[in-house]
Design a protein with these regions (language model features):
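Hydrophobic alpha-helical segments
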Residues: 1-74, 125-130, 138-148, 152-158
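Acidic, low-complexity N-terminal propeptides/linkers enriched in Ser/Thr/Asp/Gly that mediate export
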Residues: 7, 38, 86-233
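Glycine- and acidic
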Residues: 47-54, 77-87, 99-100, 181-183
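Stable alpha-helical elements in mature extracytoplasmic
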Residues: 63-70, 78, 97, 110, ...
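M16/insulysin-pitrilysin zinc metalloprotease superfamily fold
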Residues: 73-76, 105
Length: 233
């Protein structure tokens, strides 16, 4: 019927109730594929022309792609090999996105240093390195610069993490989104990329000081697992 479950709707009218179930034979299926591997990391498992709606909440494909790459490297994987795959931290979204960011020429010496760092980066998210921190802060600020004025603050805040494929599509196909509606000048995509870098670097400097060489991703990228009951005891 109406809607797809991605937004709140009046549940008492019946207009948005499910109309039925997907036939079992039409459910996505992969059985003993020729490649010998099955990979999923919450990424899309059906094509765009699949007739039934499953969800809008697919993960971006990068983890799925990377796991597939690693599994295809050798025919058999011992236990320690699977441990290495689980611990792999190559960022395929950085592989895709960094060249796009670096197309915008640096506008000051600090930006030039960052361009040099990211241009030589191997895209591994190592805790001891500055590059992962700079990259993540940059794309976070870039998404804000591209979308916050268009979507409004409330809707923008619903974007939990940077959406790299969406940003790449905007930069490639919808440059009108690069203009900041809150200013009197018409910004280009290069302007927004450069501005977002400055804001990212300023933000990191407030956290870790002005010395770029001393910055570390691991000091900001922390996973805290709190006990739901006893953490406050």
């Amino acid at each position: 019927r109406k809607g797809d479950g991605s937004m709140p709707v009046p549940g008492w009218t019946g207009e948005y109730d499910w109309a039925g179930f997907v036939p079992f034979d039409a459910l996505p299926l992969a059985y003993n594929p020729a490649s010998g591997i099955l990979v999923n990391a919450n990424a899309r498992v059906v094509s765009d022309n699949y007739r039934y709606f499953i969800t809008r909440d697919w993960a971006e494909p990068y983890r799925q792609r990377r796991a597939g790459q690693l599994l295809r490297e050798v025919e058999r994987h011992p236990v320690y090999g699977m441990i290495a795959i689980q611990a792999d931290n190559l960022s395929l979204d950085a592989v895709d996105m960094v060249p796009v960011l670096l197309k915008s020429a640096p506008r000051n010496p600090r930006a030039a240093k960052v361009h040099d760092l990211l241009g030589r980066w191997n895209h591994f998210m190592l805790a001891s390195r500055a590059e992962p921190l700079i990259y993540t802060a940059w794309i976070t600020e870039l998404q804000r610069g591209l979308m916050a004025d268009e979507l409004g603050n409330e809707l923008y805040q619903s974007l939990a993490t940077p959406n790299v494929p969406l940003m790449m599509r905007i930069l490639r196909e919808q440059p009108g989104w690069c203009d900041d509606g809150g200013t009197r000048v018409a910004e280009t995509c290069d302007d927004i990329i450069a501005r977002s870098l400055e804001r990212a670097l300023d933000g990191i400097a407030r956290l870790q000081g002005p010395d770029i060489d001393a910055w570390q991703w691991g000091r900001e990228h922390l996973a805290v697992h709190r006990h739901p009951l006893f953490d406050g005891v």
